[in-house]
């Protein structure tokens, strides 16, 4: 039975719900871009993208501001991704390149195109994670990130195949140590338990051992004859177990025929993945993962039957399709279930959605593209702001990713508690109140002594009628909260912040219009307008509702 498509109204509430789950936040510009389109048209555009990113560039210096004091092999303003670190263990260069990668990734999310690429890249990073503390190699981190964003909406078998032999994953889960003489079960176990089938799905310990033997012989190279090279995947036939591999009844008693020669690893890996994908539990597991990321952590019995089951069937029917994940996501995001009232506002935002969504919503200014040094500094500040809020992107807690996407029964509620709320709240306030400043001793003269801060007046001027305090409050509620708030709370916000304790709306209207007419006005009340707006929005940011989507 196919999943039930949504046939109800597709107005602003439905559009904002879809965009909040598909993008990092929903800005007034996002909303204006899609308004008037049908649901199918919006989802088609969200799923239409390529990996057209440009690589990170060297915009860093040593601790003294000297561009030649570190990573001198890479010219300032050029990319480092195609230059091996020499020597390999130069931790100073590794650190600055990792920070460059972090800033680059943050910049892509902050400046995301209006499609699902960045959200899906985060999804797969959580599902197929590596930790920078273990894979302490910037080129490997960059390569895997590019692999995820290139394959994020494509064919699942191809993606899991590519990740399995990617140097970052070979290193992270000991694949490079998995040899015929001493099989290492680490990756095989996680392949079954975390990446394709799920714990307790029915595979046996003997299946893990057999899969480990299938995967023997894969390794990677980061130096050649003592000279550092870019990470390269290799298959070394002498280290591969050439005997047959027997699997249990869970896998229909499949026997993967042992292979020899240079193609043995590729042949057996594909046979292993075909065997896994033939098990119905694989399709259900992946669809549950997508559901928990885009819809809700807890999956009810009804959702399992009416959503997961049909999506899994669609997944299996398109097992060879190059856009398999896009097909499944399109069905999910256009389903009746996705737009049900119970799903709207039911999830706690992860810290990336929270912080990047606010940076986008308030249009935090960023330096011109040519000012690579200033842009790097701003993006890196925002990367650490996201980490402060609770999600250091390069440091998922373990190979299972973040607990909010797998830990029953709390799931996304784990993001928000008495310990995390102050940090999350401070991060939101930092976006509205804070500024990022660049130092005087930059390499690029144009990157020196700059300050970037949200233009709160420019933000409210995007709203329907910011001079009308009632319209202003209504528009802010619509943008900041998924669910409406009471008229009494709206009235309280209006009187406390906009009317200065007065009764008539004219007090705000006159002050706002006076400031807009002349930002240098001598009207003392009008001079306070930008501060009043920050106070108002800052107070609205503190509400628990701000953390839901």
Mark where each language-model region is.
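Hydrophobic/aromatic residues in well-formed alpha-helices
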Residues: 15, 31, 39-42, 208, ...
């Amino acid at each position: 039975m196919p999943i039930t498509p949504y046939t109800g109204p597709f107005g602003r509430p439905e559009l904002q719900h879809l965009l909040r789950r598909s993008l990092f936040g929903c800005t007034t510009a996002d909303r204006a871009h899609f308004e008037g389109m049908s649901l199918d048209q919006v989802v088609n555009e969200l799923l239409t993208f390529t990996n057209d990113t440009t690589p990170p560039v060297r915009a860093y210096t040593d601790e003294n501001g000297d561009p030649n004091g570190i990573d001198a092999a890479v010219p300032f303003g050029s990319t480092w991704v195609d230059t091996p670190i020499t020597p390999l263990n130069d931790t100073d260069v590794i650190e600055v390149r990792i920070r460059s990668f972090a800033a680059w990734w943050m910049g892509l999310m902050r400046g995301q195109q209006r499609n699902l690429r960045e959200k899906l890249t985060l999804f797969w990073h959580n599902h197929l994670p590596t930790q920078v503390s273990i894979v302490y190699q910037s080129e490997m981190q960059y390569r895997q990130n590019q692999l995820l964003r290139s394959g994020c909406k494509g064919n699942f078998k191809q993606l899991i195949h590519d990740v399995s032999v990617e140097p970052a994953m070979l290193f992270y889960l000991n694949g490079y140590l998995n040899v015929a003489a001493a099989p290492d079960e680490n990756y095989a176990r996680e392949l079954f338990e975390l990446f394709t089938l799920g714990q307790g799905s029915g595979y046996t310990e003997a299946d893990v051992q057999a899969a480990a033997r299938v995967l023997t012989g894969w390794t990677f190279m980061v130096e050649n004859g003592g000279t550092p090279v870019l990470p390269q995947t290799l298959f070394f036939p002498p280290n591969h177990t050439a005997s047959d591999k027997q699997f249990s009844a869970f896998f229909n008693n499949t026997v993967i025929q042992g292979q020899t020669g240079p193609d043995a690893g590729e042949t057996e890996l594909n046979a292993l993945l075909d065997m896994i994908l033939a098990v119905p539990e694989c399709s259900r597991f992946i669809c549950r993962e997508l559901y928990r990321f885009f819809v809700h952590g807890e999956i009810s019995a009804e959702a399992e039957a009416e959503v997961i089951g049909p999506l899994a069937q669609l997944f299996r029917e398109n097992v060879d399709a190059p856009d398999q994940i896009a097909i499944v996501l399109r069905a999910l995001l256009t389903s009746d279930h996705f737009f049900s009232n119970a799903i709207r506002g039911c999830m706690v935002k992860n810290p990336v959605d929270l912080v990047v969504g606010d940076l986008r919503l308030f249009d935090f200014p960023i330096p011109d593209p040519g000012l690579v040094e200033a842009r790097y500094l701003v993006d890196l500040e925002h990367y650490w702001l996201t980490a402060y809020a609770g999600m250091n992107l390069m440091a998922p807690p373990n190979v299972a990713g973040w607990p909010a996407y797998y830990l029953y029964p709390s799931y996304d509620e784990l993001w928000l508690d008495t310990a995390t709320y102050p940090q999350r709240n401070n991060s939101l306030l930092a976006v509205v109140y804070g500024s990022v400043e660049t130092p005087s001793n930059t390499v690029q003269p144009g990157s020196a002594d700059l300050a970037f801060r949200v233009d709160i007046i420019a933000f409210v001027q995007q709203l329907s009628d910011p001079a009308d305090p009632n319209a202003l409050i209504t528009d802010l509620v619509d943008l900041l909260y998924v669910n409406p708030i009471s008229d009494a709370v709206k009235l309280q916000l209006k009187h406390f912040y906009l009317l200065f304790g007065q009764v008539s709306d004219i007090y705000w209207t006159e002050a706002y219009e006076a400031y807009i007419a002349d930002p240098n006005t001598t009207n003392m009340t009008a001079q306070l307008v930008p501060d009043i707006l920050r106070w108002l929005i800052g107070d609205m940011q503190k509400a628990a509702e701000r953390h839901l989507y």
